[in-house]
């Protein structure tokens, strides 16, 4: 068992433009090599582009996209005897949100296109409409949990 204490989580402050903690979390996930201003500019531009294309409030589209990508259940490997079982576990809210943001950024980067602004805005709009790679990843995670439901009694 680990002797280390758990890391104290620092509170995430709301971003100045949208006054949303979720936007700050997304900025931090987008950031590469400490370039927060660049990540912020990309995210704000993507949200503006979402507003231009959909005509809806960009924060609403963003929140809906994150909600649609958030997994409710996932599988974790558990070793019992000599076998490793994929045990379905409920996902805590903070982890679910973190996974959703990670998947949105990951699949935005994989998209074909010229600029990150375009790729991110397209992924956000797709996720808000319950399509897109990030939503597919959540469904795949849920399918894995459903397939391994027989091992739920190994939960820890």
From Swiss-Prot:
GO cellular component: cytosolic small ribosomal subunit; ribosome
Entry keywords, A to Z: Ribonucleoprotein, Ribosomal protein, RNA-binding, rRNA-binding, tRNA-binding
One GO BP: translation
Classification via PANTHER family: RIBOSOMAL PROTEIN S7 (PTHR11205)
NCBIfam families documented for this protein: rpsG_bact
Function: One of the primary rRNA binding proteins, it binds directly to 16S rRNA where it nucleates assembly of the head domain of the 30S subunit. Is located at the subunit interface close to the decoding center, probably blocks exit of the E-site tRNA.
This protein's name: Small ribosomal subunit protein uS7
């Amino acid at each position: 068992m680990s002797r280390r204490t758990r890391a104290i989580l620092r509170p995430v402050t709301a971003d100045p433009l949208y006054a949303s903690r979720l936007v700050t979390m997304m900025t931090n996930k987008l950031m590469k090599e400490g370039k927060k201003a660049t990540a912020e500019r990309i995210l704000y531009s993507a949200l503006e582009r979402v507003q231009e294309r959909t005509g809806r409030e960009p924060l609403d589209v963003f929140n809906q996209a994150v909600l649609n990508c958030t997994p409710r259940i996932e599988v974790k490997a558990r070793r019992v005897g000599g076998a490793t079982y994929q045990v379905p576990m409920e996902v805590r809210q903070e982890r679910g949100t973190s996974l959703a943001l990670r998947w949105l950024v990951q699949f935005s980067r994989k998209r074909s296109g010229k600029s990150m602004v375009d790729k991110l805005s397209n992924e956000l709009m797709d996720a808000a409409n319950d399509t897109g790679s990030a939503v597919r990843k959540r469904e795949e995670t849920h399918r894995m949990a459903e397939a391994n439901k027989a091992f739920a009694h190994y939960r820890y």
